[in-house]
Amino acid sequence: VTDPVLTIPGRPIEGFCDGGRRRSRRHALKIGGLALGGLSMSRLLAAEATGARSNAASGGLGHKAVIMVYLPGGPSHQDMVDLKMEAPAEIRGSFRPIATSVPGIEICEHLPRLAGMMEKFAIIRSLHGGLDQHCSDLCLSGYPIGPRGRQDGHPSLGASLSRLEGPVDRAVPPFVGLTIKTRHAPYGNPGLPGFLGAAHAPCQPDDEGLASMRLSGVTLDTLGDRRGLVEGIDRFRRWRDASATAGHDAYAAKAFDVLTSSRFVEALDVEREDAATRDRYGRGSADPAFGEDAGPHWMDQFLVARRLVEAGVRCVTLSFGSWDRHHSNFARLPDQLARFDQAITALVGDLHDRGLDKDVSVVAWGEFGRTPRINKDAGRDHWPQASCCLLAGGGMRTGQVIGSTNRLGEVPQDRPVHYQDVFATLYHRLGIDVATTTIPDHAGRPQYLLDHREPIAELI
């Protein structure tokens, strides 16, 4: 039986899934067989109904979740959280450190909000394990692009969570990717499912049908009115009945719940927030930062991420900014750091205000650091030998710096921390023991989630 198409009329939309161009067209929302960015609704419901275990409820959320912020291009560790004021001028640059709310910790002057709530963050200054690869794979899965292709088949954290935990709510996907599409595809990867397959790929709300629901003013009230939708809905119901008779996947008949339940769709609608909350996060634009092929200065993503985890999503990924600063590093970073500073502190502060800081972990990082020496174009080049990471929430021990680099910021000196050590910590805060937990690969063979399976002791 062929899946039907329920078409919802659209209106002009801007800056969501078309790179900022205005357009007006009809979008198709397929019900039943549609893969929401790879995760079919029928599979989502099947996972819930077959008894996917849920995380132990605690705090105000009822499940554990993680928000993963990818900084595409590789942020400059020595211009953000690891300034080297004793180094020569060609190393240290023009930014100056400021004191934070935690005595003894200093960070960049262009991160004043973060400095003011340092007690809610942890900084890793000795991050290593990256390669000279421009891609989000390492930051979303713990694995770089290997000889067998993207992540060597290893699933992202979100995909693994989808497989291990399933959905919290049958109308809410467990894994959502907000990352915008980019010409350089690895920048726009929201987290690949790897050998777990498309059933555990992220739901991407910029898919045309879902974008139409979110941005065209189609609300539950609109659906309740059903004017202009009656024929499509009736067609779906006839297909549902025929499918059941034909022995088609019974779970597809329940997929309509995703449409008629407003919980997920409403979570995507930041306009439901009051103006003060919107201003706290900073709004921003979905257009690529500086017109470059990277992430956006779109602070609304951080607010959407918070709303999604409240709605029942287990993992949300997003990208922010353009950090591949081979030139104009000190001209471009002040504005970008100010926007990032506002968004990340609004998110973490909001989680604390809502009592969700024990349930929701936040990580922000890029694929590598930048060269200690400033180049002739006032930029810094790729430097996989050392990088940095920001962590918050998840009940982690914050208000501390872990590790250090040497005098010039070239390599980890004290307490080297591998990217996968961070993943082991995130899994731990999600209630998953990476030392014993496995997932099946294509051949059904059990595979560990990580090669490095020891959480960072200082954080737990």
Task: Give the label of every model feature segment.
Residues V1-I460:
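Ligand-binding pockets and gating/stacking loops
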